[in-house]
Amino acid sequence: MKVSYNWLKDYLDLTTAPEALAEKITRTGIEVADVAQMSAGLKKIVVGHVLSCEPHPDSDHLHVCEVDVGEEEPFQIVCGAPNVAAGQYVIVALPNSRIADNVKIKKGKMRGVVSMGMICGLQEIGFADSVVPKEYVDGIFVFPEAIAPGTDVYEALGMTDYIIDLDLTANRADALGIHGVAHEVAAIESLTPHFEDVAVSESDVQTKNQLSAQVADEQLAPTYHLRMLQNVTVQPSPLWLQTRLWNAGIRPINNLVDVTNYMMLTYGQPLHAFDADTLTGDHKQIEVRLAKTGEKLTTLDEAEHDLTNEDIVITDGNQPIALAGVMGGFNSEITANTKNVIIEAAIFAPTAVRKTAQRHNLRSDASSRFEKGVNVADVQVALDAAAAMMAELGAGQVTAGVVSPTNLAPQPKVIQFDSARVNRVLGTDMSVQTMINLLERLGFEVANNADQLTVTIPARRWDIEIQADVIEEIARLYGYDNLPSTLPTGDMTTGALTTEQKALRRTRHTLEGAGLTQAISYALTTEEKAGQFTLAAKQTATVLDWPMTQDHAYLRMNLVTGLLDDAAYNVARKQTDLALYEQGRVFLQHADQARPNEVEYVAGLMSGNRQVKSWQEAAAPVDFYTIKGIVDTLMASYNLQAAVAYQATDAYPEMHPGRTAAIYVGETFVGIVGQIHPKIAKATHLKETYIFELDLAKILELQRQTIIAKPAPKFPEVTRDIALQVPEAITNADLVNAIKEKGGRYLVSVSLFDVYAGSHIEAGEKSMAYTLTYLNEDATLTEEEVNAAFEKVVAHLVATFQAKVR
């Protein structure tokens, strides 16, 4: 909202400088984006009177003008504007003047003819194209009235005025009119605004005999008023009105339309004027209703719009003539030939106006105000003021009476609260009288009954709803800078992470330490992806009632598909060596509740090379054992109650049937690890890709609650190596479990150090070599004790697996 400082002074006895006033406004809660004076930087620009205008002897578009600029002799100025003519009062930049963008104008020659300055358009002295009257956009500006030559143009064009640009939040729509801003400034400066009463001089013709109106549904337009003017003359507005408009960022059009915009700026109430003679029938009829499917409307910007049954329209009983609260129709536009005018002032349904403006891409000053709300008490006041001014400027007659099919009466809003609560909330020691004074400065009526305050809110402040709003108003005027600063009080407590939080943090640290990079995927996906790689029993994915897109309609039940999408994205950009993980929640349905359970999972993905090629080493591709080793490291970090075991599985159609293992902690299934199915890899353009997915919620339940530290052993370990030739179907886990079963109480670890299949080994068999480590924590082991335990292991392996000791 651009606020004219001079316009404010029409209502307030202001003495505070504009910059200081802007600072005060900002400190009370309305941000001031800028304070500007359009004349700043300009020099030696005056009003000139064109005495004569002749064609340039050496040009088909230039004119040689004699211009009275208040000097002893007229100045000869060459001008290229197509609309320059003798008798005009124009803007003249004298020699050595400064115009917009710090351009200096000098005496010069144009095609051999001396030119003593420049006749200017508004844009050349700093006006935006959007506020220049259309008839002057491509030419010079012509003053609509005579002004003494040589007079500085700044005052005449309103350029000496200071414009305070308010950056309003949606709740302060009351400041979208100069009256609302005047009330705000009056409260800040402890002043009383003085507004003139509106008086309308009416003719003997009754409006109701010329015009009728109806509103199909009161919800569409709770308030709807119409007035009528007859025998008006459409002409340019006086200069004072044009300056008020362009200083507010609005283009002047003609005296009737300019009045509606002026009243919108004054009261914050949008108005619209219809050419009454364009409406069908002798007795004019206005109807407010929802549009019908198939109806069209060409708006004032000459764009045609296909209307929907959610658009509120104004009709003449037959066809739409305006989009209510947004923009008028081209078919009822005020033109130079308009003689009779209907003025509309209304309150339209805010949500409907907002949706219509968005749907048709027609954001306007009017729609912005209707969306945020308008002052119920000022609707007819603005209408009456507009009618009176139109009659004055257009020399027309206002018919008697207002047609009002709906009229929402202002409802007094009363808020009661304990004055002590204000001090509790603000941390102040403010007296009750101070609170009352602050509220009365805002124009609120206050009654005090034993420090219980009853505040009556004026209709212009419809943003005040509850006690907290009133307390905020007190704080604003009291001054946020005056509120005392206090340190928080209370007992100091030591923060700590829960067991679960520690485990989750340890998970991230472990995986990042192993070289994986964290990824974050959308929790919403497609139905197909939601059901893949699921650790839980097959179930239906949870679907959103109102999804944003079909690709984000279901809640995920796994993390792997998100990692695959991330991998495919990277591969498409030539990044093929990938190591990613994601820790997050999946959503699993539960039979006893409508909403799904949120379960903590962690998943990882590796593809490409784990070791890039260098001058020392060849490239090493990722394989099953690479990712299984990472899972082993991760599982070891949890201090689990039972051993971790891997069992081959082909139960997952998305996984390679021969390179996938189910992961167990004791007897509890907690996840999978393995290679994704080649078909899925091909579909996503990935090389061999390995993944793991773990149910962290289950794993955290299987942690030991305490960790017992052991001292370093005092006695030496003893190791024995054994190489076994076994059938290929025998797994490492089978052999390790068998060794531990018969290893005796001194066996502390078993590690595989070699696997071989090839020459010197029968087909269908392989060689696996292990190191067995023995330790007695209380004494040194003897050879006899170790050999006896080792021989039991060998005998058991031979008997169980038909193993051959090599």
From Swiss-Prot:
CDD domains membership: PheRS_beta_core, tRNA_bind_bactPheRS
The record's free-text note on cofactor binding: Binds 2 magnesium ions per tetramer.
Superkingdom: Bacteria
Protein family per UniProt: Belongs to the phenylalanyl-tRNA synthetase beta subunit family. Type 1 subfamily.
Sequence ranges assigned to domain FDX-ACB in this UniProt record: 713-806
Positions of Mg(2+) binding: D463, D469, E472, E473
Quaternary organization: Tetramer of two alpha and two beta subunits.
Name of one Pfam family that matches: tRNA_bind
Enzyme class: ligase
Reaction(s) this enzyme catalyzes, per UniProt: tRNA(Phe) + L-phenylalanine + ATP = L-phenylalanyl-tRNA(Phe) + AMP + diphosphate + H(+)
One cellular-component annotation, GO: phenylalanine-tRNA ligase complex
Occurrences of domain B5 (ranges): 410-485
Presence of the UniProt keyword Aminoacyl-tRNA synthetase in the record: yes
The keyword Cytoplasm is annotated on this UniProt entry: yes
InterPro entries noted in UniProt: aa-tRNA-synth_II/BPL/LPL, B3/B4_tRNA-bd, DNA-bd_dom_put_sf, Fdx_antiC-bd, Fdx_antiC-bd_sf, NA-bd_OB-fold, Phe-tRNA-ligase_IIc_bsu, Phe-tRNA-ligase_IIc_bsu_bact
Protein name: Phenylalanine--tRNA ligase beta subunit
GO biological process, one term: phenylalanyl-tRNA aminoacylation
